[in-house]
């Protein structure tokens, strides 16, 4: 189809890491990104090692998008406890970075972006991740997000549009 990348969601549907594996295995150049995998769906070590496994098998073709999800999904659907998003995401990313991996490490470190809208989460995206994936933002949001992230970080805003001739 001529696409360079595809983003696969995860909330109450298919497992994003499994979907990413299937798509990466069926293509040769396509970059597959999770947009967004909730951190409450798996612990930090499972996420880190899943990412490392995909990076080993498909170097440079997987982008791990992570987010804190929504309180109702975490508590009412998953039966978990929703805590303050910023410190929760910080602890999760730090735990991912520290997670042991006994297998042969991939040749390159995997890339991670986080769902970030506000200035504090955007700053965390620049500090502990490779960038941000702001969801449903106006075009004006992008300039401010770039200023917070700084150059060299991934900024992948999700902006909806309607193609119409009327």
PLM regions and their residue ranges:
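Internal, conserved structured core segments that host functional sites
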Residues: 108, 113-121, 128
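Hydrophobic faces of well-ordered beta-strands that scaffold small-molecule active sites
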Residues: 4-8, 31-35, 62-66, 112-115, ...
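Glycine-rich "substrate-gating" loop/helix at the edge of Rossmann-like oxidoreductase active sites
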Residues: 11-14, 37-42, 81
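N-terminal beta1-alpha1-beta2 module of alpha/beta enzyme domains
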Residues: 1-34
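Active-site-adjacent beta->alpha loops and helix N-cap segments on the catalytic face
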Residues: 12-22, 136-151
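Short glycine-enriched loops at secondary-structure junctions
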Residues: 12-14, 68, 118
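Flexible, glycine-rich active-site loops centered on histidine and acidic residues
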Residues: 41-105, 124, 128, 138-148, ...
């Amino acid at each position: 189809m001529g696409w360079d990348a595809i983003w696969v969601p995860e909330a109450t549907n298919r497992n994003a890491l499994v979907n990413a594996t299937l798509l990466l295995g069926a293509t040769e150049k396509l970059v597959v990104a999770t947009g967004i995998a909730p951190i409450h769906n798996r612990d930090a070590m499972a996420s880190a090692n899943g990412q490392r496994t995909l990076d080993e098998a498909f170097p440079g073709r997987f982008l791990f998008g992570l987010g804190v999800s929504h309180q109702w999904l975490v508590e009412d659907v998953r039966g978990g406890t929703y805590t303050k998003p910023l410190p929760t995401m910080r602890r999760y990313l730090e735990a991912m970075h520290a997670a042991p991996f006994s297998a042969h490490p991939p040749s390159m470190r995997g890339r991670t972006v986080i769902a970030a809208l506000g200035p504090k989460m955007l700053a965390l995206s620049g500090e502990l991740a490779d960038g941000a994936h702001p969801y449903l933002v106006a075009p004006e949001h992008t300039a401010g997000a770039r200023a917070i992230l700084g150059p060299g970080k991934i900024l992948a805003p999700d902006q909806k549009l309607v193609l119409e001739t009327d």
